[in-house]
Amino acid sequence: MTPEHLPTEQYEAQLAEKVVRLQSMMAPFSDLVPEVFRSPVSHYRMRAEFRIWHDGDDLYHIIFDQQTKSRIRVDSFPAASELINQLMTAMIAGVRNNPVLRHKLFQIDYLTTLSNQAVVSLLYHKKLDDEWRQEAEALRDALRAQNLNVHLIGRATKTKIALDQDYIDERLPVAGKEMIYRQVENSFTQPNAAMNIQMLEWALDVTKGSKGDLLELYCGNGNFSLALARNFDRVLATEIAKPSVAAAQYNIAANHIDNVQIIRMAAEEFTQAMNGVREFNRLQGIDLKSYQCETIFVDPPRSGLDSETEKMVQAYPRILYISCNPETLCKNLETLSQTHKVERLALFDQFPYTHHMECGVLLTAK
């Protein structure tokens, strides 16, 4: 695979290899055949980041080869959304001959939605001033004249200039209902929107008929907790990043959801609060003991669950675990399988043509 060529003819083979690999990794814990969810074969990434290479009067997007560290020029990127590809061409054309916008520009980040909105961030090794803002506004207006629904942001050390806004609103059809998700620039969002829809619908399917409340750790912008709210009496969710918490609160209101409570704290802190080890001012007015959480949902970082959180989740009858790293999932399962068994197993091809796998497991108490 090269940045400008996807081996789409190999899609089925690479997916089959992942299925075999996941089954092998999960063999000590389950003999289930994974439910497999396919990605679009191209234009599946909704975000992308590129370094900018200055070559005399020219400049262009590059990425670095992971093995050799050599730079690779990228003029088109079929893994990314069609909107990102349109913007890549338009941004280079708009910046190349503009001394103010191109001077010390070293990176461009793109974030797009299925609803055809975009935020483009230009990163600089220089101070950004009013002249930069004027030129950036002219570029933004020129892009919009090309029917590109785009918001521009300038970033430099300790500086962020959002010309209009630093977010876009995604609209996803999830099990017959449109979900609105505010996505903030430089915050985590699911990179493959088509796969995200399938992950949300799978999570809804495995939790249908649930009793009681749901607890979610690492909720981000509320991606899962808001979609799952329809299956539970109440949802209690934690997140540490301020922009994500603010986006989650917006998303609760935008989706007219009244049974989700977001708390800004780390999973480790929440564990201490639940166990009565510490009291937190942030929890004033929230009666943790009133929640009857029968199900806990975790979507941890690549490092997986820490040992304290492992112990905490074992107290719940049902554990729904979405993993972006099956190796750390299996490490966690060495502990979790002592008290729980795997009921459902899914493979989500979030990153086609790469080694990476995303998977989901539903665990129930033995």
Curated annotation (Swiss-Prot):
Residues reported in the UniProt entry to bind S-adenosyl-L-methionine: 190, 218, 223, 239, 299
| Catalyzed reactions per annotation | uridine(54) in tRNA + S-adenosyl-L-methionine = 5-methyluridine(54) in tRNA + S-adenosyl-L-homocysteine + H(+); uridine(341) in tmRNA + S-adenosyl-L-methionine = 5-methyluridine(341) in tmRNA + S-adenosyl-L-homocysteine + H(+)
User: So what EC number does this one have?
Assistant: 2.1.1.-, 2.1.1.35
Q: Which PROSITE patterns match?
A: SAM_MT_RNA_M5U (PS51687), TRMA_1 (PS01230), TRMA_2 (PS01231)
Signal peptide position in this chain? none
Q: Which UniProt keywords apply?
A: Methyltransferase, S-adenosyl-L-methionine, Transferase, tRNA processing
The record's Gene Ontology biological-process terms are: tRNA methylation
Which GO MF terms does the UniProt record name?
rRNA binding; tRNA (uracil(54)-C5)-methyltransferase activity, S-adenosyl methionine-dependent; tRNA binding
Q: Which family does it belong to?
A: Belongs to the class I-like SAM-binding methyltransferase superfamily. RNA M5U methyltransferase family. TrmA subfamily.
Record-linked PANTHER family: TRNA/TMRNA (URACIL-C(5))-METHYLTRANSFERASE, TRNA_TMRNA (URACIL-C(5))-METHYLTRANSFERASE
Quote the function comment for this protein: Dual-specificity methyltransferase that catalyzes the formation of 5-methyluridine at position 54 (m5U54) in all tRNAs, and that of position 341 (m5U341) in tmRNA (transfer-mRNA).
Name by which UniProt lists this protein:
tRNA/tmRNA (uracil-C(5))-methyltransferase
Which source organism? Escherichia coli O157:H7
